[in-house]
Every structure is written in C-alpha cells, then in structure tokens.
A protein has these predicted regions:
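Surface-exposed, charged secondary-structure patches
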Residues: 64-107
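Short, low-complexity N-terminal intrinsically disordered segments enriched in polar/charged residues
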Residues: 6, 11-33
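Short helix-adjacent coil turns
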Residues: 31, 35-42
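A short, surface-exposed interaction/processing loop segment used at functional sites
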Residues: 109-118
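Positively charged n-region of N-terminal signal peptides that target proteins for export
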Residues: 1-4
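Short solvent-exposed beta->alpha transition segments
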Residues: 25-26, 41-81
Length: 118
C-alpha cells in the first residue's frame, strides 16, 4: 500500500512538473521572439497583472528598448536551474551573455524577470 501511494505521488508530481516546464518553455519562447521584434505590447501581455501595474507599459518599453540597444538580439535561452520557484537561464545576446531569472505565476504569466551578470 505504501508503495502504491508513493508511486501515485511520484506520478502526480511528475505531471505537475511537466506542466510547469511546458509553461516556462512557452513563455520563454514568446518572450524571446517578442523581445527580438521589440513588440512591446506582446511582451507587456506576457506579464502578470501585478507586474503590469508595477512596471507600466512605459516602463516595459524602456526596459525592452534599453536592453535591446545595449545587448542586441536575444539569440538563445539555456536552462540552468530552478531554485525557490525561480528558473535561471543563460541568456545569450549578440553582445553579452547574462543570467535571466524568471518566475511565472500560476497562470503562466511573468511575475518576476531580471537579467544579471553571471
């Protein structure tokens, strides 16, 4: 009985993690495409409502345009690790490689995003 319960917990956990990974994959791909196109509206729509209120569309515009002019296109995102609900990626731009930290809300919207030097 214990093993059946343990197996059920493992299968359920694996299913939840797979759904979580799929949400992150979808969001990172959309962010990369919209960042490179400098589609501010599309990037803004990826943000959770709380982030939209906090950053405003003008703030997102400054963030995207500033990063794009300084770093170039975002060529590749490579998963590094997940810790405390935040996924870390190596973000390879034309001019620099940075670490991108990303946290999604339960709806798959960006709750936190930041770039920093490795």
């Amino acid at each position: 009985m214990k093993y059946t319960l343990l197996l059920l917990v493992c299968i359920t956990t694996q299913s939840i993690l797979a759904q979580d990974a799929a949400a992150y994959e979808t969001t990172t791909k959309a962010f990369q495409e919209n960042f490179n196109a400098q589609d501010i509206d599309a990037v803004f729509d990826l943000y959770a409502p709380e982030m939209q209120e906090e950053m405003t569309k003008e703030g997102v515009t400054r963030f995207i345009k500033g990063c794009h002019s300084q770093f170039g296109n975002l060529n590749n995102l490579t998963f590094i690790e997940s810790a405390e609900g935040i996924n870390s990626y190596t973000a390879a731009f034309d001019n620099i490689s940075l670490v991108m930290e990303l946290k999604l809300n339960p709806d798959g919207k960006i709750a936190t995003i930041q770039f920093q030097e490795p």
